[in-house]
């Protein structure tokens, strides 16, 4: 077995919730550390995230100390992480060998710049760059279709962050990890060399299967469940509007929302404004395990109303429980959701609500699509398969 030394830079990780990139580096590190040496570079909040996800026992950590700077607010803390990570890359010594793998877990500067610097200092090492979503056009905002609010300012900052990093990755990275076929077009030269790998994401199939064996036929308490970050791209505000349409047809319909994020206060206000307090339950962020699995098991459908997205692991975790998914017809979903989902024209909130109501009223159709969803996940969405993809390409 070829042995590698992995250096994973994940200084952008923060908060209780997990982004897709966070989930990928954590699950990779867990499995890689069984046979490989793994060092994860994070700051204190990222370390706490890893610890909550059960990663702390199996890898080595290098923790950036930015506690002093974080007293001055998010922006100063953010900048401090960038400069501290750069300085760390300047002074750190690693083995200058092709068996040394530097993995930048995101395109954010505190992950990509130290990886770039180490690649310059130690040219024999191999840089694997994570690029799991290309920022939207700042003039279009977070949408691929009709949307009342596009969150253009947030989109601009996201675009600006990626602007200097993409050329560095194109020129210096040895491999790029993306999570759908469309993203490969961002790195055509590397793709022609076979160095762009599509990592579709995965779910913890083994844990879910074990839970389902022990907890069969739980009562359906919730009609629909949503899981995801309360972020502009995820459509959480519009989901409340959708649910208002649903309850006009099914007055007692219940929606469970798992997640947290910058739009939480707006979500709560929208629920109050539309008087949906009895129809929507907010759980906040729920960690992996029996509580979250119970919510999925007690639900009939999962919705993923993102207006701009490159994947959808959060919804696919629920699909592993046999829940059919409903989402907007985004371009990335052609490869990410080949089955088990009903797609709606982007921005058609009434149409989205109609599909929810139709599936809730048609158990046979709901169960059929749910079986397709579960089959797709069980056959193709194992983390062990994703790690095998990575190690196979590294051996080339």
Regions found by a protein language model. Give the residues of each.
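Nucleotide-activated donor-binding/catalytic signature segment of Leloir-type glycosyltransferases, i.e.
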Residues: 268-286
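A conserved mid-protein helix/loop that constitutes part of the nucleotide-sugar donor-binding site
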Residues: 20-23, 27, 226-245, 262-268
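Short hydrophobic beta-strand element within catalytic cores of glycosyltransferases
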Residues: 324-327
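Conserved acidic donor-binding segment of nucleotide-sugar-dependent glycosyltransferases
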Residues: 341-350, 358-363
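Membrane-proximal helix-turn-helix segments that form the acceptor-binding/catalytic region
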Residues: 117-121, 134-137, 149-176
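Carbohydrate-associated surface elements
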Residues: 182, 202
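Aromatic "clamp/platform" in nucleotide-sugar-dependent glycosyltransferases that forms part
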Residues: 307
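N-terminal subdomain of nucleotide-sugar transferases
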Residues: 1-53, 57
């Amino acid at each position: 077995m070829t042995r590698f030394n992995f250096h994973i830079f994940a200084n952008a990780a923060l908060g209780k919730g997990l982004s897709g990139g966070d989930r990928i580096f954590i699950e990779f590190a867990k499995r890689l550390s069984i046979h490989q040496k793994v060092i994860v570079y994070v700051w204190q909040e990222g370390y706490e995230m890893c610890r909550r996800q059960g990663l702390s026992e199996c890898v080595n950590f290098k923790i950036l100390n930015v506690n002093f700077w974080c007293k001055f607010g998010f922006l100063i803390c953010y900048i401090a992480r960038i400069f501290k990570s750069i300085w760390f890359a300047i002074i750190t010594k690693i083995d200058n060998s092709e068996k040394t793998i530097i993995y930048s877990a995101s395109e954010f500067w505190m992950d990509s710049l130290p990886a770039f610097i180490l690649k310059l200092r130690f040219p024999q090492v191999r840089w694997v760059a994570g690029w799991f979503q290309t920022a939207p056009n700042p003039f279009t905002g977070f949408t691929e279709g009709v949307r009342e609010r596009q969150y253009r300012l947030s989109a601009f900052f996201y675009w600006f962050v990626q602007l200097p990093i993409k050329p560095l990755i194109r020129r210096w990275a040895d491999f790029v990890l993306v999570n759908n076929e469309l993203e490969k077009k961002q790195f055509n030269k590397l793709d022609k060399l076979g160095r762009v790998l599509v990592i579709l994401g995965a779910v913890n199939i083994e844990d879910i299967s074990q839970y389902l064996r022990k907890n069969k036929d739980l009562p359906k308490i919730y009609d629909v469940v949503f899981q995801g970050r309360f972020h502009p791209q995820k459509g959480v505000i519009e989901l409340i509007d959708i649910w208002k349409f649903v309850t006009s047809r099914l007055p007692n319909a219940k929606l469970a929302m798992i997640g947290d994020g910058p739009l939480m206060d707006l979500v709560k206000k929208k629920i109050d404004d539309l008087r949906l307090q009895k129809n929507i339950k907010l759980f906040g962020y729920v960690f992996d395990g029996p509580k979250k699995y119970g919510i999925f098991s007690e639900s009939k459908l999962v919705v993923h109303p993102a207006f701009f997205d490159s994947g959808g692991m959060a919804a696919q975790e629920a699909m592993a429980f046999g829940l059919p998914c409903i989402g907007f017809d985004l371009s990335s979903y052609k490869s990410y959701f080949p089955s088990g989902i009903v797609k709606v024209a982007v921005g058609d909130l009434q149409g989205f609500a109609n599909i929810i109501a139709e599936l809730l009223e048609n158990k046979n159709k709901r169960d059929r699509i749910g079986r397709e969803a579960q089959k797709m996940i069980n056959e193709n969405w194992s983390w062990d398969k994703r790690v095998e993809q990575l190690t196979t390409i590294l051996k080339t």
